[in-house]
Structures are given as structure tokens and as C-alpha cells.
Amino acid sequence: MAEAKTGAKAAPRVAKAAKAAPKKAAPNDAEAIGAANAANVKGPKHTPRTPKPRGRRKTRIGYVVSDKMQKTIVVELEDRMRHPLYGKIIRTTKKVKAHDEDSVAGIGDRVSLMETRPLSATKRWRLVEILEKAK
């Protein structure tokens, strides 16, 4: 048994057929082949990056309740929802800080906001337009 094991290991393996080296084309042929390949290739070899669509940005309409800060307004956003059990419409409000570059909005103005990247620790909205000036 020991001889059979050693005999199996000692048996020569069947060699794989050697790959034939590809023929090299003459210099004039290489230029012709390169020009032909260049005509067939339409872009880079790697996969080009496709632009991903940006997520939909939230837009909200609310009333300015404070304009005391520089280039910042505080807007009160109102949300109305129906109570799941009793059906009564409940009004909830939320105050958000919004960027007002030119400081044009005043207290009581009805404004349109759009979500944006974080501009400060608490500011994530920007003023799009003033829909109605306060009286």
C-alpha cells in the first residue's frame, strides 16, 4: 500500500500543451491594425460614470416668525393631519431655520423653502421666494 501511494505521487503528470506564441505583425501591419481598432472603439475601455439623479428635494411653504439673525430666518411650517382613530384634523407646527442670503424676508411674510445641504448646525433649508409680503 505504501508503494502504491508513493508510486502515484512519483508518476509523471501529463504536461499541458504549450501555448503557441501569437505571431507578431510587421510594423506596417500594426499601424493598419491599430487604425482599424481605433475606428471600431467608441469610448474608453473602462465603464464611464453615469450621472445619478439627485434625490427629490423637499419644498415647504410657511410663515416667517423671526428675522433677528444675519442671513437667517426662522420659519414656522404647519402640517395638518387627520387623527387615525377619531378623525379630527390636527394642526402641528415646526420651526426651522432657513438661509436668507440678502436678508429680504421680514416677520409675517409667506415664504417658500427648499431643502439643502447642512449650512450650519441647525440650518438645512434655504429661501426660494417670498410668496406674500406681510401687511
Curated annotation (Swiss-Prot):
Claim: Ribosomal protein is one of the keywords in the record: yes
User: Where is composition skewed (Low complexity) in this entry?
Assistant: 8-42
GO MF annotation list: rRNA binding; structural constituent of ribosome
Alphabetically ordered keywords of this record? Ribonucleoprotein, Ribosomal protein, RNA-binding, rRNA-binding
Record-annotated membrane-spanning stretches: none
Q: Which NCBIfam families match?
A: PRK05610.1, uS17_bact
Mention any additional remark.
Was identified as a high-confidence drug target.
Its recorded name reads: Small ribosomal subunit protein uS17
